[in-house]
């Protein structure tokens, strides 16, 4: 997916120039090729000094499949002795006399630019329709033609952009500001970033003349050799709700309830303690991850105990259960919540305790879990948000509770998912991280939600809502 702002920029009337700049390996060429693929109706041409045509097809096989639509032109050192008269000034045209001016320059080291004859012919043939020309890279072309980048961009503007309304994309192999940035109508920068040893990629829209920039920065991936950017995170709901599709557990592991998460972590081992740590400004949508695990276990005859918090209180859990088509299994859930005299408990799946009693008897969750297991049988998952426990217990009592939970989980061969939010004390975070079997981080970056494993270490994945199965799920895309 190409950012909407870039598509709008290349779709508006008239000619324009767009610079794609970035250090080597940042994905500039792949984006340029993706633009050609997206604008096949614009007579796309790819002028390159990097590779031969065969090499381009070898590295980007989809271009070979598009040979009729996309023309790959290699920059070679040949002579150009063919010039044409200027057409009527009111008509769209290729201004070839600009190249004639270049040919008259008294420079013994000059290289003739014969491949532009092919470019001009192709643009001419396509008029009055507009064409798209990719120059990859301008440094390579200018080095070959022995001209400055400023001169070359001016030449392209005089010859193709203004008179023929050609769209020209210029690949630039550097990040610092240059004089041609001011000549171009649009500039985008591509970045590779390191986050704790994990690679992330970001595209920044520096300017797009005449286009509103609603999202100036996009995370993107180059997975499978294709460019794909990610929009700001937005919750989605299915048009029609369908029953939850369980993923079978094994003798040794519980499924996470999500196929992508299972592929990354191999499921959750029976008796394991899972830490789900969230960063600042992460939406409550992240509760979908533990709720998928709970739905998967309950749908296979198990049960779930959940310590209620604002993001997953009794009403939210009930809504999830009904949306997953598990209304007949509602009593396989047990939501433990703080007693509220103004909202008396009327549901069998809700258990309310006053705060003082909870503080003096922190194993209430385990007692409820044992009751539920005796009633329902099967596997059990316990979901605990330590934000509420932190308000009830002092530091040392909370640490003892964490260690007790870890031992109880392993001894009783259940699954515990501990939720640790950004606001929790660093000492508690450290204790949870140390005793966890799997440690997953969920963060928000440029309004896009990401996930990665601290234990075991994984790459970064972008979290997107997925309602394709008829219920709230997530899709995880590797950032490569």
Please provide the spans of the model-predicted regions:
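P-loop NTPase motor core
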Residues: 108-182, 187, 355-435
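Glycine-rich P-loop/Walker A and Walker A-like loops and their local beta1-loop-alpha1 context
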Residues: 2-5, 12-51, 255-314
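Conserved inter-motif catalytic segment of the P-loop NTP-binding fold
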Residues: 42-141, 302-391
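A short acidic (Asp/Glu
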Residues: 56-58, 180-182, 286-288, 315-320, ...
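Flexible glycine-/small-residue-rich
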Residues: 74-76, 207, 278, 385, ...
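C-terminal regions of RecA-like/P-loop NTPase motor modules
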Residues: 1-2, 214-300, 456-480
């Amino acid at each position: 997916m190409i950012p909407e702002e870039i598509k709008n920029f290349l779709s508006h009337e008239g000619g324009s120039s767009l610079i794609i700049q970035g250090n080597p390996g940042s994905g500039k060429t792949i984006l340029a090729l993706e633009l050609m693929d997206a604008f096949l109706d614009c007579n796309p041409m790819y002028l390159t000094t990097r590779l031969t045509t065969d090499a381009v097809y070898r590295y980007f096989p989809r271009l070979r499949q598009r040979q009729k639509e996309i023309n790959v032109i290699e920059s070679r050192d040949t002579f150009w002795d063919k010039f044409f008269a200027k057409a009527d000034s009111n008509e769209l045209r290729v201004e070839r006399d600009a190249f004639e001016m270049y040919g008259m320059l008294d420079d013994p080291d000059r290289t003739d630019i014969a491949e532009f004859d092919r470019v001009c012919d192709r643009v001419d043939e396509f008029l009055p329709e507009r064409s798209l020309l990719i120059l990859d890279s301008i440094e390579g072309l200018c080095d070959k033609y022995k001209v400055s980048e400023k001169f070359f961009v001016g030449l392209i503007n005089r010859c193709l952009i203004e008179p023929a309304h050609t769209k020209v994309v210029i690949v630039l192999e550097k990040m610092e500001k240059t004089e041609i940035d001011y000549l171009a109508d649009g500039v985008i920068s591509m970045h590779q970033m390191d986050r704790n040893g994990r690679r992330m990629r970001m595209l920044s829209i520096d300017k797009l003349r005449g286009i509103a920039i609603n999202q100036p920065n996009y995370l993107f991936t180059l997975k499978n050799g294709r460019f794909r950017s990610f929009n700001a995170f937005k919750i989605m709901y299915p048009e029609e709700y369908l029953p939850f599709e369980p993923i079978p557990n094994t003798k040794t592991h519980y499924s996470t309830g999500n196929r992508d998460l299972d592929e990354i972590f191999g499921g959750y081992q029976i008796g394991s303690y899972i830490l789900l740590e969230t960063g600042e400004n992460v939406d409550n949508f992240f509760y979908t991850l533990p709720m998928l695990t709970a739905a998967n276990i309950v749908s296979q005859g198990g049960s779930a105990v959940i310590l209620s918090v604002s993001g997953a209180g009794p009403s939210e859990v009930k809504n999830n259960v009904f949306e997953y088509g598990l209304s007949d299994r509602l009593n396989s859930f047990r939501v433990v919540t703080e007693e509220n005299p103004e909202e008396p408990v009327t549901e069998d799946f809700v258990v309310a305790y006053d705060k003082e009693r909870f503080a003096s008897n922190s194993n209430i969750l385990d007692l409820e879990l044992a009751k539920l297991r005796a009633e329902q049988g099967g596997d059990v998952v316990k979901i605990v948000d330590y934000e509420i426990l932190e308000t009830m217990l002092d530091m040392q009592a909370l640490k003892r509770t964490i260690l007790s939970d870890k031992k109880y989980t392993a001894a009783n061969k259940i699954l515990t998912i501990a939720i640790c939010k950004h606001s929790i004390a660093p000492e508690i975070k450290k204790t949870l991280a140390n005793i966890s079997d799997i440690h997953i981080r969920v963060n928000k970056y440029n309004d896009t939600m990401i996930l990665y494993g601290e234990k075991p270490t994984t790459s970064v994945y972008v979290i997107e809502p997925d309602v394709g199965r008829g219920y709230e799920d997530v899709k995880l895309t590797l950032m490569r």
